[in-house]
């Protein structure tokens, strides 16, 4: 992967993105982002989770589309394939996932606006860097031969495996709550799929997906989002594992936090 594209604006934004990734990697060692089971309604301003997630993720679709469509190669085969993979991911993360969140009726909003703001910064950077890179092909690497390159093929396999694990794991968690009792607030231990091996298979799937994406696109923008994702999700996975073990006395002892049979 080459560092400089020769486009001053792009290279500057990429540098800023790497600096932000470093901040997330360090910050994640000391605190968890206040959403989900680690959310607090006592500090700061909070939004409805559906709205908060949607606002946080929407730049990944909108900003990506704007800058992708400005590129001269926007209708070339490889950029179109990469854009399709992108839209597959953010069709799920930015649109389907927020709409599918099951919120307890009458429960206070719990999605902290600071999480939304930080997330919007990430998805804006991410959308610009990838949308612009794909359709401008700054490094002249996206000829049709890229579709048979081992980096693309290997990365695609890893990406699809991770994406499948992510979607399946979120489906299992989403269906833990009894539809006949939507007001239930208690947490339950999920079983099946990746939960047989780790506490946070959705996080593992997300990490695998972005690792595969970085490989199949072979650009530094993909590496940035993998680092940011790791900085957020790796420590969160360990905190989640600890939370489950403390809350449920009969929690499966064979489960690891994030990587099957390892940690």
Predicted regions and their residues:
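Membrane-anchoring alpha-helices and their flanking helix-loop junctions
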Residues: 1-197, 204-263
